[in-house]
Amino acid sequence: MAEATYTPRLRTHYDSVVRPKLIEEFGYKNPMQVPVIEKIVINMGVGEATADTKKVTTAAADLARIAGQKPVLTRARKAISNFKLRENQPVGAKVTLRQARMYEFMDRLITVALPRVRDFRGLNPKSFDGRGNYAMGMKEHIVFPEINYDQVEQIWGMDIIVCTTAKTDDEARALLRAFNFPFRQ
């Protein structure tokens, strides 16, 4: 039985444009040395979950719509009485995207979601961690086209972490620039 092979647009772009560009720029001898995006982790912390646990499930449903994959509920590791937080209480949701879903999400993030962010001046070029990973935060999850603005009960923020195999921040920055990430000048 022959399976239909589907390759995301950005994966094809990586193979045809990004990889040769990075080999030329950094002078890699082996094509396996070229950095690649390993995974994208989306984390949504719901602070109001201490009062109402239903909000976590609503946030998780929105995150599932955005990512196209069921999220894992994150739970409190220890109890903190000042925050009215008990151990093992759900406090958020997270999703790890790899392969095709990762490229599809990245495509929607770059082409649709980031241009819809209010007062967007570009991504912070200093948000690299020193090991080739990039982290960014979004204040509103309603910028994604999968979320219907009229049916949203509450607006939540999210953290998006792009993990790469790059050894340095410069390599990771060149990789993400080649994918047209809109960095601030």
Curated annotation (Swiss-Prot):
The organism's place on the tree of life at top rank: Bacteria
Keyword terms of this UniProt record: Ribonucleoprotein, Ribosomal protein, RNA-binding, rRNA-binding, tRNA-binding
Molecular function, one GO term: tRNA binding
UniProt entry tagged with the keyword rRNA-binding: yes
GO cellular component: ribonucleoprotein complex; ribosome
Pfam families: Ribosomal_L5 (PF00281), Ribosomal_L5_C (PF00673)
Any single GO BP term: translation
Role, per record: This is one of the proteins that bind and probably mediate the attachment of the 5S RNA into the large ribosomal subunit, where it forms part of the central protuberance. In the 70S ribosome it contacts protein S13 of the 30S subunit (bridge B1b), connecting the 2 subunits; this bridge is implicated in subunit movement. Contacts the P site tRNA; the 5S rRNA and some of its associated proteins might help stabilize positioning of ribosome-bound tRNAs.
PANTHER family in the record: 60S RIBOSOMAL PROTEIN L11-RELATED (PTHR11994)
UniProt family annotation: Belongs to the universal ribosomal protein uL5 family.
Subunit structure: Part of the 50S ribosomal subunit; part of the 5S rRNA/L5/L18/L25 subcomplex. Contacts the 5S rRNA and the P site tRNA. Forms a bridge to the 30S subunit in the 70S ribosome.
Protein name: Large ribosomal subunit protein uL5
Species this chain originates from: Azorhizobium caulinodans (strain ATCC 43989 / DSM 5975 / JCM 20966 / LMG 6465 / NBRC 14845 / NCIMB 13405 / ORS 571)
Lineage, broadest ranks: Bacteria, Pseudomonadati, Pseudomonadota, Alphaproteobacteria, Hyphomicrobiales
